[in-house]
Amino acid sequence: MTLRRGSCPLLLFSLVGLLTTCAQEPDAAGQNTTAVAEKAGTCPQAELEMPDRNCTEACQSDAGCEENKKCCRTGCGTSCQIPDEKPGSCPNVDTPIPPLGLCKTTCSKDSDCSETKKCCKNGCGFMTCTTARP
């Protein structure tokens, strides 16, 4: 192959255009390959048996969801959902005597708790909504 004079800039511009196009191509999941910050928490488990299945692709990534909601699979689509697990960790429960009035289960997962509270062990074998440690 012989290159004619003046053809190198054309070749260079073609390569730059190709690299720019490849960098913006969506990946196999249909999301852009540029990194988008993922929000904290884990998506609720998608229900496999749903009578009226919602197959709508309501979001592409967590960035498309408001507040602390995450873009989660719904069985055959996606939707913005409140995550099961919230950021932070449960406080240590080291009391030899369990706190009065808290010996009952009030939650089973973080999404059962309001705002930033987490579902944690309460010292007497049950789970309750507690303020999380950072």
From Swiss-Prot:
Cell compartment(s), UniProt: Secreted
Top-rank taxon: Eukaryota
Pfam families given in the database record: WAP
Residues annotated as signal peptide: 1-23
GO (cellular component) term, any one: extracellular space
InterPro entries for this protein: Elafin-like_sf (IPR036645), WAP_dom (IPR008197), WAP_four-disulfide_core (IPR050514)
Key words, A-Z: Antibiotic, Antimicrobial, Disulfide bond, Repeat, Secreted, Signal
Tissue: Expressed by the venom gland.
Main location: secreted
WAP domain: residues covered: 36-82, 83-133
Annotated SMART domains: WAP (SM00217)
PROSITE patterns: WAP
Molecular function terms from GO: serine-type endopeptidase inhibitor activity
GO annotation terms (biological process): antibacterial humoral response; innate immune response; venom-mediated disruption of cell wall in another organism
Disulfide bonding pattern of the chain: C43-C72, C55-C76, C59-C71, C65-C80, C90-C120, C103-C124, C107-C119, C113-C129
Stated family: Belongs to the venom waprin family.
Function, as annotated: Damages membranes of susceptible bacteria. Has no hemolytic activity. Not toxic to mice. Does not inhibit the proteinases elastase and cathepsin G.
Protein name: Waprin-Phi1
Natural source organism: Philodryas olfersii (Green snake)
